[in-house]
Each structure stands twice: as C-alpha cells, then as structure tokens.
Swiss-Prot record:
Pfam families: Bax1-I. Its main location: membrane. The gene is US17. The lineage of its organism: Viruses, Duplodnaviria, Heunggongvirae, Peploviricota, Herviviricetes. It comes from Human cytomegalovirus (strain AD169) (HHV-5). This is Uncharacterized protein HVLF1. Glycans are attached at N287.
Length: 293
C-alpha cells in the first residue's frame, strides 16, 4: 500500500508500462491513416494497371506492325508525336478545371472519365506507332521511373516547408545545368531550340505530377477516380515527352523535308503523281542530306 492510498483509503495500482522506443502502438494508428493508406493503394494500383496496359498495347502494335513508321504519312512528316500531345493536354486542362478554390467540385461521371482515358490511350498508341520498339520500351521505363520519383519526393517532403525548399532548389539547379550543357553541345540551333523546349515541358510536367501527388493528402474517397485519371494523364504525358526528346533530331529533319516537298509542289518542281508521300519525303530528305554534306 502507498502512503497516499492509506490516507485516501483507495487501493494502490501500479502505473501502466511505458512502450519502449521503436515500438509502434496499435492505438496510435487512426482510422484516418488507414483510410488514407487504402486511398493511396486504390489510386496507384489503378494507375499501374492503366499504364501497364497502355504500354503493352503500344509495344504490341510496334512489334506486330513495324512498317507503320515508314508508310503512314504523318509518321514520315514527323508530326505524329507532337500532335499526340494535344489530347492529354486538353484532358489535363479539363480535369484540373474541375477544381474550385482548392477543392474538387462534384466529381464527373464514370462515363466521362472513361472517355478521357480511352482518348488518351489511343493518342499514345498512335504516337508509338511512329517509333521503334526500343524507343517505346526505354521511354516507358524512364517515364515510370520519373513518375515513381515524383511520388517518392512527395512522400519524403510531406508538409515540411524546409524540405520543399531544398528539393525545389536542387530541381532548378538541375534544369539550369541541363540547359547550359545543351547550349554548349555542337548541334544545330534548331535542334537546340526543340530540345530545350521539350526539356522545359518535361520539367513542367514533373512539377505538375508532384502537385497532383500532394493532393492524395487532401481529397476524399469520392474524388479518387478523378485524381487517378489526372495521374494517369501525367504518366502518359511524361512518356510522350520522353519519346519526342529521343526523336527530336529525326522529326526535325522530316519536318524540313516535308516543308521542302510542299514548296516544290507549289512551284511545280516535283511530280508527285507517281510517288507516294513517304517515298517522296525520304527522297527529299536524302537530297537535303547530300546537299548539306
């Protein structure tokens, strides 16, 4: 019996044991934490399934029809990969337009989200048809790595403003260093401008992906489908930008050949009646290469 318990007449009970360091008490995990974990699992599993199916369809099309990049006219002009960015750009603008003062308005119907997803997937497949299987595979893997890196950065920084400042500073330094290195490369000015433009677009999309990932800590369960589609759009946008970066030089040469072909048709210098569009563009490109050499 404790002296205090004798004075008060109550039975003395030993204090509860303190948990040792490194031991997580089950009671410290709240219902909100469990719900947030399930929400993250739902979002990322859906994005993973969508992204995997899209990349497999792209790779399957390229392997099944490897001649498309040499026979489809838009592929021969170099327009197809940049044109494919229009669909995810419009979809992302519409999806982010659903936000109102920092929170989503009423979530769109599942049918509308499905339409967005199908249109984006088709644009990615069409753009991949103008590339090789090696480029499709490498671009898809690199896009997944960058997307995962954005998720890791978001989880590492959390709500710590100091960490965000360090991450943003390192990111800006990396972008500036890349642009300086690109400027010092012995390549034509047109190639530098195209590469610099798409590199800046890729940097911007990384920022957008990190921003969308931070919303995992804010949204409700009913808004998960909308955020899932946003992250999927970000993933395929990264893939398309990487694909364009690896094919910029070839696309620029094709574009110059196409413009030369148009000018020759306008002046009547070329008889295109007996030659297909792609064959004619390849002939013009070979002539330009010999002239520049």
């Amino acid at each position: 019996m404790s002296p205090n318990s004798e004075a008060t007449g109550t039975a003395w009970a030993p204090p509860p044991p303190r948990p040792s360091r490194g031991v997580i008490m089950i009671s410290s995990v709240s219902t909100n934490d469990v719900r947030r974990f399930l929400l993250c699992m739902r979002v990322y599993s859906t994005v993973a399934v969508q992204g995997t199916c899209t990349f497999l369809l792209c790779l399957g099309l390229v392997l099944a029809f490897p001649h498309l990049k040499g026979t489809v006219f838009l592929c021969c002009t170099g327009f197809m990969p940049p044109l494919s960015l229009m669909v995810p750009t419009i979809c992302l603008a519409l999806l982010h337009g659903k936000r109102d003062e920092g929170s989503f308005t009423s979530p769109p119907s599942p049918g509308l989200l499905t339409i967005y997803s199908v249109l984006t997937t088709l644009s990615v497949i069409v753009a991949s048809a103008c590339s090789s299987s090696t480029l499709v595979t490498f671009s898809g893997l690199l896009a997944c790595v960058l997307f995962s890196l954005c998720s890791c950065v978001t989880g590492l920084a959390g709500h710590n403003h100091r960490r965000w400042q360090v991450i943003v500073t390192l990111f800006v330094i990396g972008v500036i260093a890349f642009l300086i290195a690109l400027y010092l490369q012995p390549v034509p000015l047109g190639h530098k401008l195209f590469l610099g433009y798409y590199a800046m677009a890729l940097s911007f999309m990384l920022v957008v992906t990190v921003f969308d990932t931070t919303r995992l800590f804010e949204i409700a369960w009913s808004e998960a489908d909308l955020l899932t589609l946003c992250l999927y759009e970000n993933l395929v946008y990264l893939y398309l930008l990487i694909l364009i970066l690896f094919t910029t030089e070839d696309s620029l040469d094709k574009l110059i050949a196409w413009m030369t072909w148009l000018s020759s048709r306008a002046t009547g210098a070329t008889n295109a009646a007996s030659i297909s569009g792609c064959d004619l563009l390849r002939e013009v490109q070979r002539n330009l290469t010999r002239t520049m050499a």
